[in-house]
Amino acid sequence: ELGQYIEQEERTDVMAQVTSVSQSEFMSAGQMGFKPSMEFRVWQFEYSGEKVVEYNGTRYAVYRTYKAPDGRVELYTEDRVGEEVQD
């Protein structure tokens, strides 16, 4: 034991509404250096601050969240092709 911290990934399946990001989100996020890709809407009780979403075999990094008044959380993500996504 070297006292090294080894991070282990825990996966959880949840139902989500999946859409492309709006043009205005694409433009504003692009100005901040993000490359917006997809928006996922999940129930607030199912989201615990995770920074990575996997959908259809592709990993997306969460760059922004929004708690909607209907009890859901909107997860705005970017596709980091060829990059390591940090959890």
Model regions: which residues?
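Short, conserved turn/kink motifs that form compact alpha/beta structural patches or helix kinks used as
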Residues: Q4-D87
